[in-house]
Amino acid sequence: MEQYILKLENSINILAFLGALVSSLFYWAKLTYYKQIQVFSLPKFCLIFSNCIIAGMLLERCFRYSYFPLSNLYESLLFLSWVLNIITIIFVDKLSIIGAIGSSAVTLIIGYANYILPPSLRQTSILAPALRSNWLMMHVSVMIFSYGLLIMGAFLSLIYVIVNNNLSQKSLNRMFYLPSFYVDFDKNEPRNDIGTATINRNKLSYETIESLSYKFISLGFISLTLGIISGSVWANEAWGNYWSWDPKETWALITWLVFATYLHIRINKKWNKIYASLVASLGLIVICFVTWE
């Protein structure tokens, strides 16, 4: 019976994967081609469609097993993709590159969870007594929510670093139709204006990317702090000690230290924002380790 349900879940999740993939392709096409995509509502609709399927899968597991589905890596990845989808849907109208980042991340996560993760890791087993606690839902959901925010912020920081340091305006012109590419960061309209006005708009786009990255990471850092504290309380309640230095705890602490360093550099006006963005980009690698650990 369990194998049949897993096959059914895989079939349904194909729709979520395709929705995120189509959305990703449209958003990247909109950023990299001059002509405005007339069906701009389609990628956002695909994201919403994909998100509804993921939410349905989580709710189905919740009702079937009578607890919030965050007990294994598969369920955690589904929840992470749902969080990233929500963030993307909310903020894509403010900065269209968020649509490209968020939908691509969701596509990769769903693809990994359904096509690479071994079936044994997707099956749910009976929870250990220590996991039958309300702290499970609170701690894990807050941690994954924080990772979703930090992933989005770190990706934006990475783009900020690349655009400011590694690409000149001439090289960008060779890669993209420059007016459309930059203006699309801020608005969903193509522009033909060039020259000083365009350069000023480009700088505004850079600052918009960096500012949103800072806001995402700040909120994610607060959530991560709350998640670590709730996890410590849960550990003390279940096992009698607040910290045991297991891999999950260690990587969560490393993640906290990396983004604490980012915030320290970012707030200190003596440092250039580019250094803070480099640290945040490093945090993206750390999050990958802590998520898949």
UniProtKB/Swiss-Prot annotation:
Cellular component per GO, a single term: chloroplast thylakoid membrane
Location of the protein in the cell: Plastid, Chloroplast thylakoid membrane
MF terms (GO), sorted A to Z: heme binding
Highest taxon listed in the record's lineage: Eukaryota
GO biological process terms on file: cytochrome complex assembly
Keywords recorded for this protein, A-Z: Chloroplast, Cytochrome c-type biogenesis, Membrane, Plastid, Thylakoid, Transmembrane, Transmembrane helix
Topological relation to the membrane, as annotated: Multi-pass membrane protein
Transmembrane segments: 12-32, 39-59, 78-98, 99-119, 142-162, 216-236, 250-267, 273-293
Functional summary from the UniProt entry: Required during biogenesis of c-type cytochromes (cytochrome c6 and cytochrome f) at the step of heme attachment.
Family of this protein: Belongs to the CcmF/CycK/Ccl1/NrfE/CcsA family.
NCBIfam families the UniProt entry points to: cytochr_II_ccsB (TIGR03144)
Subunit details: May interact with Ccs1.
Protein name from the UniProt record: Cytochrome c biogenesis protein CcsA
Native organism: Cyanidium caldarium
Lineage, highest ranks first: Eukaryota, Rhodophyta, Bangiophyceae, Cyanidiales, Cyanidiaceae
Gene name of the encoded protein: ccsA
